[in-house]
Amino acid sequence: VLYEKDARQKLEPASVTKIMTLLLIMEALDSGRIARDDMVTVSAYAAGMGGSQVYLKEGEQMSVSELLKCITVVSGNDAAVAMAEYLSGSEAAFVAEMNLRARELGMADTNFVNCTGLPAQGHLTSAHDIALMSRELILNHPSIREYTTIWMDSIRDGAFGLTNTNRLVRFYQGATGLKTGSTDSALYCVSATAERDGMELIAVVMKSPTSAQRFEDAKALLDYGFANYTLARVYPDVPLAPVEVLLGTTAQVQPQLERECSLLVRKGEEGLISTQIQLAQDLEAPVERGQKLGQMVVTVDGEVRDTIPIVASQQVDRLT
């Protein structure tokens, strides 16, 4: 977290709620439970949703992909409920899954009462929790960007135009999404995401007095992050030397980092990053590929920021 203010205050999220709705839809899509070209039949209940909508009719059929577009671009309440019913049988059952997922993500300030964000007693979350679900969505389901970055589009073969409620998509460099919301009681909210130079930031603004103000505040937060922080790739200070293997078909094994390491640091602090390599001595065959041989400890100005396992890059059999 680069900056926060009243981040744990429980407030109404309005349609920013739909980030969780989208997360559950994307999880179902990416796990193969449903497909983008599945056709969904709209119920009378879904068609009767008030607020922002795409005027779905009872019995109308629309693909999962089109409904996703309706939810991300124009925040269609009717589309959100149609998808909730398609996935879970009823909105109530879907909301139970939303709350379960919120618990799993550590969203302690959150209670969902519906999948749309329409005003309801006890339907609350915090800026902190919105950031958590936003991160989960963009990190693990990057294809959501295909929808959240749409500025203008249409459905029903061009008969119904869609323009994104998120102005940043059109007017902020690197904007990738994510979701706006507004009601009379929640006022104006947004979870805004943007990426520059491989670094993606999330800015959450709640209870802003005007629509323009929420975008200005989100822009200021993102600008602050991009101006002051950078993502630094970390490599070992010295090359990883081969490790001796006793009784092996080869005398050595080459160690490698198990994963890449990137650290978020203040600009100008890149020089304060250092690494310490801890490697096993006297390794005895057999050695499995991927077997842990040690670790690289990464510090910034003496403070440990990450520990990356070091593993064997190949298998070494035992001499027979």
Roles of regions detected by a PLM:
Residues V1-H141:
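Active-site-adjacent loops and short helices of periplasmic peptidoglycan-processing enzymes
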Residues M107-N111, P119-L124, H128-T320:
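Domain-terminus/edge residues, biased toward the C-terminal soluble/receptor-binding domains
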